[in-house]
């Protein structure tokens, strides 16, 4: 049954839902109660927006495998798609309790909190993602967005400096640091940050543009 799983996941990741459905049908004919295939069936129901059918199937799977985090992740996905972000957050916390790999769930929790404009909670989860992986630039951008909404300039500077401590040649962090300094009127520091971004990656056009605009305005 795992071979079928791999084939279905491959098709879904390439956006070929029809071939995924065909492979799933064959798999379930041979292994009708294999929970990995049943979870893929519910995932396809979700893609087709058959949410109620997916929920019933997930409830059935949960009776067989109550400690599978994927069940809660799919329930969270359904709740989010239906606009019920609070329920989605609750399901994600349930998944987090039994997960060995929290990064993805932290990110999802951050995104759900963003959607309800709870920037403090969102920033907590994006910061967790960043602590685990300083190269997680989407989480860095989301964290900086939260701090911007909260007017927490110092927190933004501190987070960027933490990234730079682990990777002093991170052009993205230098570039963002320059933009934060610029917003709070620290022109000299902003210019230095843009220059360090260029030193870190001399093909990074964003830093050249920001530096050029800054020099023009002086």
Language-model-detected regions and their locations in the chain:
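Register position in tetratricopeptide repeats
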Residues: 13, 47, 81-82, 115-116, ...
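Structural marker of alpha-solenoid helical repeat scaffolds
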Residues: 30, 63-65, 97-99, 132-133, ...
């Amino acid at each position: 049954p795992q071979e079928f799983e791999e084939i279905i996941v491959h098709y879904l990741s390439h956006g070929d839902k029809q071939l995924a459905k065909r492979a799933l049908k064959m798999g379930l004919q041979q292994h009708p109660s294999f929970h990995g295939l049943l979870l893929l069936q519910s995932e396809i129901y979700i893609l087709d927006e058959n949410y109620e059918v997916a929920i019933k199937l997930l409830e059935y799977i949960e009776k067989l495998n109550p400690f599978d985090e994927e069940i809660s992740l799919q329930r969270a996905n359904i709740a989010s798609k239906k606009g019920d972000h609070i329920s989605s957050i609750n399901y994600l916390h349930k998944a987090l309790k039994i997960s060995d790999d929290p990064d993805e769930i932290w990110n999802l929790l951050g995104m759900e909190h963003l959607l309800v404009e709870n920037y403090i909670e969102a920033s907590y989860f994006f910061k967790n993602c960043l602590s685990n992986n300083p190269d997680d630039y989407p989480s860095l951008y989301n964290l900086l967005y939260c701090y911007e909404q909260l007017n927490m300039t110092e927190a933004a500077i501190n987070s960027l400096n933490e990234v730079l401590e682990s990777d002093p040649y991170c052009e993205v962090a230098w570039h963002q640091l320059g933009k934060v300094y610029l917003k709070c009127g620290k022109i000299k520091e902003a210019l230095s940050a843009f220059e360090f971004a260029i030193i870190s990656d001399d093909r990074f056009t964003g830093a050249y543009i920001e530096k050029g605009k800054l020099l023009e305005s002086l």
